[in-house]
Every structure is written in C-alpha cells, then in structure tokens.
C-alpha cells in the first residue's frame, strides 16, 4: 500500500518507520528543509510515561487564576481572538474533575508505556543513538501539599503497573546527587526508575535517515495546501507544486492539523506554546544525571551528553512564536535554583515551539470517517514520550494487524457524544458509528 504522511516531525517520522517496516511504500511531506525542525527540535528531552498527566486536572481552574498574578507561572492564557480558543479552554475545564482526570491519565499512560517499550525495541534492533539515558525521571515537590497529592498519581501508576519510588527530601540525592545542595528547599519527590531521556531532534533526524535507507521517500520544502475528497475517500493532497496521490493518507501536522482538516473533520487540537533553554555543562557534579520535573513551575531539567536542556511552561496564545524574555528568565531561575554552577548560563540558547494539545490530554491516533485517512496528532507536551508507540499503533491499524494495546478510545471518535467502546459490536468499525 502507498501511504503519504503529512508532517516530518517525530510523529510523522516514527509513523513512516513503522509503516515501511510492514512493507508499505511511504512518502513523507513537510514544509521544512529537513526532519524535526519545528516542535520536535527543542523539547525537554524526557521520555516519561509515568508523568503522562493531563493538564485538565482537579484544582487547575483555581490554580490558573492564581498563576495569573505570579511572575514565574507555569501557565499563561492570552486571548488570540478566536472562538476556537474559547471552545478549547471550555472543553479542557470540563475535564478537570476527578473522574475525567483518572480516565484521561489512564489512556495517556497506556500509550506512553507502550511507546517506551517500542523505543527500547527500536534501540535494540537498530542501535540508534540520540544522547539517550535510561536513568529514570524524578518529580520534585517544593511543599507538603504537592508531596501528599502524589498519592493520586500513585494510584493510577499502581493500576497501570508502573514502577515508582516516593522519596523524602533526604533521599533525593540517591537519584540525583547534585540535589544534595538544595534538599532543604524540597519536601520530596516521585521517582519513576524506568523512564528515559534523549534528544528528540537527534533521534528524529537519525531515524529519518534510517527510514530513507529502508525505502521511505522524503519530500521537504513542500508546502501542503489541502486534501482532495470524493465521498468518504481522500483522492490526493494538493501541494504548492503539484498533486500527490496514494492509497492511504496520514495527517501528522501537530498544531496545524486542526486548520488543515477544517470543514472535513473537527479535532480539538490547540497550539500550547512551550519554551526551552540549552546550555553546555561546566561542572558535571552539579548537573543532573538524568532528568527532573519541578512540579511547582512545571519545568524539566534534563542531562544530555555535554548539555543541559531546561524546558516547560505553557502559553495558550495561539500561533505566536515570539520568545518572551520573562519566560527565559523563569527557565534560568529554575535551573540555577536547583543546579547552580552545573551549566554555563551565559552561553544558553533559547527556543520556543507549539505543542499540539487536546483538551483531555490524550493524543488522537487512528482512523477517521474517511476510509483511507488516519490521524496521528494531539500529543501535547508528550510527543517525544508517545512517538514510537503512536507510530507502531498507527502502522498496525493501517495494516489491519491486531494492536498491542486498546486503541478505540485513542481515536477522534471518542469526542462523539455518547461514545462508548462497550457499545461496539465485535468487528464493528468505528467509522460506522460516526
């Protein structure tokens, strides 16, 4: 089968890799000059299934109000003038109760855990290197309430069979020795020993090269205009320089997927702006050995080979890619507060990108009402964490293979009123109930 994938970030490239491994003829189309030049270029570097957590959570509405008046707030909301922004925020608020939070986190952890298994297998099969480390992740708490609230996440981790360690402030140095200097500022942490780290851009570019060697065609510097339809079927994709046709089409365009599919498929994917800082290490003893997540500021600090990557925060501001000085100051403040002297802050470089976020935090992976059109988007801040699993899952769905994990509630159909996988008859296709 000939498959065209629209989007050359980590989601599009992993989709291409797994599809070509199953014998398909694959073409990847992207407007950039090479793979992973947008959202996949500068993320925080964490592969953290256990921290796969919806932004829509109990208490978030009240916290959002408080954050409006804080200098280093993890979330900022500024009107972009669109009705879609208001609708998306309302949908997220509707997911901020305990029952929705538990359901959404369970879905996210499922695909994230599977994805980590997939990247481990990929690493074993190919030997791909991307400055990766398998040292676990550590969520840091700065007050007792955060420490106590970890019980809610631990309940889901137990349910999903995810290994964890709840550490006191004094025990943090066993996982991250450099934190010994700042243990008095912390109340403890939640460590997930099976999580990983790595440079997403390096990984994506190397996998793209491997995919090309395996037969995938990459068409870069190509502006994608729109899809052509005939009834319930896609007949082609119009680009700036001509028409491309295939048997099946995959939209993996991140935050731009929503507008691209407008008037054909409604998906609630909104651009959540994030920031990162990268600096060279000057004292390894004061740098992280793996990665931490500061729960107060929602900022991750990750160790690459000779660099420290600091990333996080969220701005609901539309497609705005301006780098704000205040956000850069927050990144600098957090890394200097926890790992002072570990990196050369004077040589820090800054980046911003748009994470494709759904209101329930769960990605959209799978079929649509159009029989030869699939989606792989909406991974939010966890695109790197979920990429390989999403790519493998999508390839299996397109190939008609039995999937390794439940997939129905990861598709766009979950947004249909009254959606319930239990109502589906055995063998019934989801597009029949659209």
Curated annotation (Swiss-Prot):
Q: Which UniProt keywords apply?
A: FAD, Flavoprotein, Oxidoreductase
InterPro entries associated with the record: DadA, FAD-dep_OxRdtase, FAD/NAD-bd_sf
User: What does UniProt give as GO cellular component?
Assistant: cytoplasm; plasma membrane
GO terms (BP aspect): D-alanine catabolic process
Provide the GO MF annotations for this entry.
Answer: D-amino-acid dehydrogenase activity
- Requisite cofactors: FAD
Q: Could you tell me the superkingdom of the organism this chain comes from?
A: Bacteria
| Catalytic activity of the protein | a D-alpha-amino acid + A + H2O = a 2-oxocarboxylate + AH2 + NH4(+)
Reply yes or no: does the keyword Flavoprotein apply: yes
Q: What is its EC number?
A: 1.4.99.-
If you read the UniProt record, what top EC class would you report for this enzyme, in one word?
A: oxidoreductase
* Annotated pathway: Amino-acid degradation; D-alanine degradation; NH(3) and pyruvate from D-alanine: step 1/1
Binding-site residues for FAD, renumbered to this chain: 3-17
Extract the Pfam families matched here. DAO
What PANTHER family does the record point to?
A: D-AMINO ACID DEHYDROGENASE, SARCOSINE DEHYDROGENASE-RELATED
Q: What does this protein do?
A: Oxidative deamination of D-amino acids.
Query: In which family does this protein belong, per the annotation?
Result: Belongs to the DadA oxidoreductase family.
Under which name does UniProt file this protein?
A: D-amino acid dehydrogenase
């Amino acid at each position: 089968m000939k498959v065209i994938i629209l989007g050359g970030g980590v989601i599009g490239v992993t989709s291409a890799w797994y599809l070509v491994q199953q014998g398909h003829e694959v073409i990847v189309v992207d407007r950039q000059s090479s793979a992973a030049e947008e959202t996949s270029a500068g993320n925080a570097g964490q592969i953290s299934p256990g921290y796969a957590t919806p932004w829509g959570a109990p208490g978030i509405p009240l916290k959002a109000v408080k954050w409006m008046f804080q200098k280093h707030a993890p979330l900022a909301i500024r009107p972009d003038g669109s009705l879609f922004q208001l609708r998306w925020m309302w949908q997220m608020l509707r997911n901020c109760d305990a029952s929705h939070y538990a359901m959404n986190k369970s879905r996210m952890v499922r695909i994230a855990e599977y994805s980590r298994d997939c990247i481990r297998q990929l690493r074993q099969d190919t030997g791909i290197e991307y400055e990766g480390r398998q040292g676990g992740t550590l969520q840091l708490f700065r007050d007792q309430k955060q420490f106590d609230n970890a019980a809610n996440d631990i309940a889901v981790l137990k349910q999903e069979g995810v290994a964890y360690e709840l550490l006191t402030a004094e025990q943090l140095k066993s996982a991250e020795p450099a934190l010994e200097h700042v243990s008095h500022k912390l109340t403890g942490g939640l460590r997930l020993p099976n999580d990983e780290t790595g440079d997403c851009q390096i990984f994506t570019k190397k996998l793209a090269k491997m995919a090309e060697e395996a037969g995938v065609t990459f068409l870069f510097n190509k502006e994608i205009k729109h899809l052509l339809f005939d009834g319930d079927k896609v007949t082609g994709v119009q680009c700036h320089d001509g028409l491309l046709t295939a048997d099946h089409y995959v939209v993996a365009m991140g935050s731009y997927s929503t507008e691209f599919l407008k008037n054909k498929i409604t998906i609630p994917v909104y651009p959540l702006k994030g920031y990162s800082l990268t600096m060279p290490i000057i004292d390894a003893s004061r740098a992280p050995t793996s990665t931490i997540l500061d729960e107060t500021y929602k900022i991750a600090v990750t160790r690459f080979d000779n660099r420290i990557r600091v990333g996080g925060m969220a701005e609901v501001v539309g497609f705005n890619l301006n780098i704000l000085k205040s956000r850069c100051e927050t990144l600098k403040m957090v890394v200097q507060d926890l790992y002072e002297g570990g990196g050369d802050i004077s040589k820090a470089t800054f980046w911003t990108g748009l994470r494709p976020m759904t209101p329930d935090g769960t990605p959209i992976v799978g079929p649509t009402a159009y029989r030869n059109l699939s989606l792989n988007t909406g991974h939010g801040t966890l695109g790197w964490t979920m990429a390989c699993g999403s790519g493998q899952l999508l390839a299996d769905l397109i190939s008609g293979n039995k999937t390794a994990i439940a997939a129905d509630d990861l598709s766009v159909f979950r947004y249909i009123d009254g959606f319930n996988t239990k109502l589906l008859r055995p063998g019934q296709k989801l597009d029949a109930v659209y």
